């Protein structure tokens, strides 16, 4: 097989790898709560971005639901979320990645230090 064909085959295989996100970044809510506000800021800053739950048709992210993120690039962020009971939590130094089915998730364990 020629080197050119091998290169094309390699690119095709890379694009077909299961589990690699080919589209927009997504958040996965692994908490047991409905999240009504989700904001990201570069680590260590208070520069909170837009409320990402506005991207959901009902304006909230239910437990085990995924949410398309808007205007977010891969990197490290502090994540501030509010659930439907009014609990506000900040999860620090979260890695947002582009090469998975979801960019990041938050679980109930991540919220263990939040006030209830």
Model-assigned labels for residue ranges:
Residues 1-8:
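Bacterial N-terminal signal peptides that target proteins for export
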Residues 8-16:
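Bacterial N-terminal signal peptides
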Residues 17-22:
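Sec/Tat signal peptide C-region and signal peptidase I cleavage site
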Residues 23-25, 65:
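Structural beta-strand segments of beta-rich domains
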Residues 27-33:
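Asparagine-centered strand-capping/turn motif at beta-strand->loop junctions
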Residues 48-73:
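Intrinsically disordered, low-complexity Pro/Gly/Ser/Thr-rich segments with frequent PxxP/GP/PP motifs
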Residues 77-79:
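A short tyrosine-centered beta-strand micro-motif
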Residues 82-112:
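Structured interaction patches on ligand/partner-binding surfaces of diverse proteins
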């Amino acid at each position: 097989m020629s080197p050119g064909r091998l290169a094309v085959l390699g690119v095709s295989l890379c694009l077909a790898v299961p589990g690699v996100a080919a589209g927009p970044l997504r958040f996965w809510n692994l908490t047991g709560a409905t999240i009504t506000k989700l904001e990201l800021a570069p680590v260590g800053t208070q520069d909170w971005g837009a409320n990402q739950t506005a991207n959901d048709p009902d304006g909230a992210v239910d437990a085990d639901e995924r949410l398309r993120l808007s205007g977010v690039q891969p990197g490290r962020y502090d994540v501030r979320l509010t659930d439907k009971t009014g609990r506000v939590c900040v999860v620090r130094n979260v890695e947002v990645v582009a090469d998975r089915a979801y960019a990041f998730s938050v679980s109930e364990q991540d919220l263990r230090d939040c006030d209830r």
